Amino acid sequence: METPLKAPESSLGSYNEPSSRTSEQDVATQELANQGEEILSQLYRPLETCNNKCFCKGCCFHCQLCFLNKGLGICYDRKGRRRRSPKKTKAHSSPASDKSISTRTGNSQTEKKQKKTLGTTLEADPGLGR
């Protein structure tokens, strides 16, 4: 009679195994969920400064900031370091507007023609009194 009693015990043990498997699966899914949350928290964490000056492969890829700075060469430093030149006064621009377009562009042929016509008119006029 011992044999029938042992059979139900082994059958109870077989029922316990699937439940233990499901509990292991639950633990595994919880671990994956925790890892996913940790990855997301790392993704949205602000970039921190790294004092490592090494450019080896391990140091270039150990954090997102080093990957951007060392691996890709992208540096998001302050842009306020550039100094602008002082604004020029408008006194220089007014004489340029007084000049004709031909002198600003470098076309001096019109000036030569004007000088020749002025020279011929001066030579043709004998003067007022002499």
Curated annotation (Swiss-Prot):
<feature type="region of interest" description="Disordered">
    <location>
        <begin position="79"/>
        <end position="130"/>
    </location>
</feature>
<keyword id="KW-0014">AIDS</keyword>
<keyword id="KW-0945">Host-virus interaction</keyword>
<feature type="modified residue" description="Phosphoserine; by host CDK9">
    <location>
        <position position="94"/>
    </location>
</feature>
<feature type="region of interest" description="Disordered">
    <location>
        <begin position="1"/>
        <end position="29"/>
    </location>
</feature>
<keyword id="KW-0597">Phosphoprotein</keyword>
<feature type="region of interest" description="Cysteine-rich">
    <location>
        <begin position="50"/>
        <end position="66"/>
    </location>
</feature>
<feature type="modified residue" description="Phosphothreonine; by host CDK9">
    <location>
        <position position="89"/>
    </location>
</feature>
<dbReference type="InterPro" id="IPR036963">
    <property type="entry name" value="Tat_dom_sf"/>
</dbReference>
<feature type="compositionally biased region" description="Basic residues">
    <location>
        <begin position="79"/>
        <end position="91"/>
    </location>
</feature>
<comment type="similarity">
    <text>Belongs to the lentiviruses Tat family.</text>
</comment>
<keyword id="KW-1048">Host nucleus</keyword>
<keyword id="KW-0804">Transcription</keyword>
<feature type="compositionally biased region" description="Polar residues">
    <location>
        <begin position="11"/>
        <end position="29"/>
    </location>
</feature>
<comment type="function">
    <text>Transcriptional activator that increases RNA Pol II processivity, thereby increasing the level of full-length viral transcripts. Recognizes a hairpin structure at the 5'-LTR of the nascent viral mRNAs referred to as the transactivation responsive RNA element (TAR) and recruits the cyclin T1-CDK9 complex (P-TEFb complex) that will in turn hyperphosphorylate the RNA polymerase II to allow efficient elongation. The CDK9 component of P-TEFb and other Tat-activated kinases hyperphosphorylate the C-terminus of RNA Pol II that becomes stabilized and much more processive.</text>
</comment>
<dbReference type="GO" id="GO:0044196">
    <property type="term" value="C:host cell nucleolus"/>
</dbReference>
<feature type="region of interest" description="Core">
    <location>
        <begin position="67"/>
        <end position="77"/>
    </location>
</feature>
<keyword id="KW-0694">RNA-binding</keyword>
<dbReference type="GO" id="GO:0003723">
    <property type="term" value="F:RNA binding"/>
</dbReference>
<dbReference type="Pfam" id="PF00539">
    <property type="entry name" value="Tat"/>
</dbReference>
<dbReference type="GO" id="GO:0050434">
    <property type="term" value="P:positive regulation of viral transcription"/>
</dbReference>
<comment type="function">
    <text>Extracellular circulating Tat can be endocytosed by surrounding uninfected cells via the binding to several surface receptors. Endosomal low pH allows Tat to cross the endosome membrane to enter the cytosol and eventually further translocate into the nucleus, thereby inducing severe cell dysfunctions ranging from cell activation to cell death. Through.</text>
</comment>
<comment type="subunit">
    <text>Interacts with host CCNT1. Associates with the P-TEFb complex composed at least of Tat, P-TEFb (CDK9 and CCNT1), TAR RNA, RNA Pol II. Interacts with CCNT2; the resulting complex is unable to bind to TAR RNA.</text>
</comment>
<feature type="short sequence motif" description="Nuclear localization signal, and RNA-binding (TAR)">
    <location>
        <begin position="78"/>
        <end position="90"/>
    </location>
</feature>
<keyword id="KW-0805">Transcription regulation</keyword>
<protein>
    <recommendedName>
        <fullName>Protein Tat</fullName>
    </recommendedName>
</protein>
<dbReference type="InterPro" id="IPR001831">
    <property type="entry name" value="IV_Tat"/>
</dbReference>
<feature type="compositionally biased region" description="Polar residues">
    <location>
        <begin position="92"/>
        <end position="109"/>
    </location>
</feature>
<dbReference type="GO" id="GO:0001070">
    <property type="term" value="F:RNA-binding transcription regulator activity"/>
</dbReference>
<keyword id="KW-0010">Activator</keyword>
